[in-house]
Amino acid sequence: MKTTMLMLVLLVCSYIHYVCAQIRFVTPATTDSMDFTAISFSWEESNTGIPLEDITNTVFYICSGSMDAPQPCAVLYTSPSPSSISQAGPFAISQVFGPAGRLYFLWAQSTYAGGIVNDYTDFFTVNGLTGTFDNYEIYASLMALGVYPYVPTLTGFSTFLGVWPTGTMRDWYLSQTTGVLRTGPIQNRPDSTFTAATTDIQPLWETSSYSVFTTFAGPPIATSTVFASPTYMYTLYANYASTASKPTIIATPTAGLRRRDSWAQAAPKRGMRLGEHKRGLLYS
């Protein structure tokens, strides 16, 4: 008799339906591209995840960088205890916190009785932004992922100024021609103005002859590859043979070049992607 009652209890419990949480974008309809003034999302019922009634609040961040080290750019919304029909937005992002492009993902941090659940979207494009990232950690993270916060155009030396974060990987001085920046990676940093009267700075070796350099050091090599476009691969070459010459950026067509992200190869670590159907909040 006791065994029969226990089986009945287990059978009844198996039919209890808990309303679980699922997040999706409302506008735009997909997570691929959105305007900076139109980001909305909603809670929906799901057959997996954490029961909706257990969630006390969720904070939505828009981030750049990587999932392992997210760099929050802004808090979009702090949700109270949600319901299956609750919706938030549209939200506007400050235009100046970063550049436009496929650089951003959403981080939803939900608090419930058992702890905290972190969920992340895939990268998506935010249109209409006009700012820049000052934090070099964001640059480094995006470069490691194959996603870069600047889409260079082949406009000569100004391209190099835009590609690399200020203050890293280069030493600048002004050449004899007023206003022209040069880079001198193989000698000490000179004064702000470099003229013929500057005699206290000596190059580490002969730098005016390309043949001398290649004899002892070999030809210049590629120092960095920047994935800045879905159709072109930009490669930066440093010309160490002359401190007064600029690096060269080569654009190579790369049909079908696709970005990489931190969880494409490690799906079990990332939790759900917001907007996936029939999935709820998963533990990260």
From Swiss-Prot:
Superkingdom, natural source: Eukaryota
Matches recorded under InterPro entries: Kre9/Knh1 (IPR045328), Kre9/Knh1-like_N (IPR018466), Kre9/Knh1_C (IPR008659)
Disulfides per UniProt: none
Keyword line: Membrane, Signal, Transmembrane, Transmembrane helix
Signal peptide interval: 1-21
GO cellular component, one term: membrane
Biological processes, Gene Ontology terms: (1->6)-beta-D-glucan biosynthetic process; fungal-type cell wall biogenesis; fungal-type cell wall organization
Compartmental location: Membrane
Ranges that cross the membrane: 88-108, 144-164, 212-232
Main localization (coarse): membrane
Pfam families: Kre9_KNH, Kre9_KNH1_C
Protein name: Uncharacterized protein C11C11.05
Recorded topology in the membrane: Multi-pass membrane protein
